[in-house]
């Protein structure tokens, strides 16, 4: 009975790990961020200067860790902690399951994985946690080079770009939903609108006013 229970518990834990590591899908709604795709995974990217507190949620980060900011996010997957001692100190530390490498918190299993043109992610298809490479768009893992992102290859975009006048585009090594050619994002409505002569005129007027103000100052 104990062996059966132990086996059930082990399988439950492994399934839970796999489920938790595969939270981001094409249907994920990133809170205060947007969805991007690389060759082997999807992830949420934060808007402006926000940081990821988990795989789906972005929040404002604190600029300094002190007694008022304990447990507040100070970077992607990191938070301020209190370090007991004499005197007491405060520091920005990675969340459980992550390690700091080059000032970035990455999964523990990725500490010794080098990908080149891509990044290391957790392999959610493997019941044993391992780090694998997910490549920039235009590159794929090379089995002859320790699965690093050193081989040219295509990845089909799977993002659901459902807003009006937007489409999937490859930008700086990732797929993201962006405005179609001839359209520009309206910051107030977050909708892609036609970049017409009227828009150009408005920009020209703003540029002239800015130039006049600059020279007056």
UniProtKB/Swiss-Prot annotation:
Disulfide bonds join 65-80, 74-92, 94-105, 110-120, 115-133, 135-149, 157-168, 161-177, 179-192. The keyword Repressor does not apply. A lipid is attached at residue 196 (GPI-anchor amidated serine). The lineage of its organism: Eukaryota, Sar, Alveolata, Apicomplexa, Aconoidasida. This is 25 kDa ookinete surface antigen. InterPro entries: EGF-like_dom (IPR000742), Pvs25/Psv28_EGF (IPR010423). It is a lipid-anchor; GPI-anchor. Residues 30-59, 61-106, 106-150, 153-193 form the EGF-like domain. Residues 197-217 form a propeptide. GO terms for cellular component: cell surface; plasma membrane; side of membrane. Keywords: Cell membrane, Disulfide bond, EGF-like domain, Glycoprotein, GPI-anchor, Lipoprotein, Malaria, Membrane, Repeat, Signal. It is found in: Cell membrane. Gene3D superfamilies: Plasmodium vivax P25 domain. Its main location: membrane. It holds the Pfam family Plasmod_Pvs28. Residues 1-16 form the signal peptide. It comes from Plasmodium falciparum (isolate NF54). Glycans are attached at residues 112, 165, 187, 202. SMART domains: EGF.
């Amino acid at each position: 009975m104990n062996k059966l229970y132990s086996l059930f518990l082990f399988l439950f834990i492994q399934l839970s790990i796999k489920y938790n590591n595969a939270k981001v899908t094409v249907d994920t709604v990133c809170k205060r961020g947007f969805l991007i795709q690389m060759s082997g995974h999807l992830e949420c990217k934060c808007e402006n200067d926000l940081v990821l507190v988990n795989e789906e949620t972005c929040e404002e980060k604190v600029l300094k860790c002190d007694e008022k900011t304990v447990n507040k996010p100070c970077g992607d997957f990191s938070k301020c902690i209190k370090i007991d001692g004499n005197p007491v100190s405060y520091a920005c530390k990675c969340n459980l399951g992550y390690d700091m490498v080059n000032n970035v918190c990455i999964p523990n299993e990725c500490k010794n994985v080098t990908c080149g043109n891509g990044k290391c992610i957790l392999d959610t298809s493997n019941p044993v946690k391992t780090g694998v490479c997910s490549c920039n768009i235009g590159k794929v893992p090379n089995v002859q080079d320790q699965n690093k992102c050193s081989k040219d290859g295509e990845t089909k975009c799977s993002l659901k770009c459902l807003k009006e006048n937007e489409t999937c585009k490859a930008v700086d090594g990732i797929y993201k939903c962006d405005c179609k050619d001839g359209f520009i994002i309206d910051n107030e409505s977050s909708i892609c609108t036609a970049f017409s002569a009227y828009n150009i005129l408005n920009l020209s007027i703003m540029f002239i006013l800015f130039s006049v103000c600059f020279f007056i100052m």
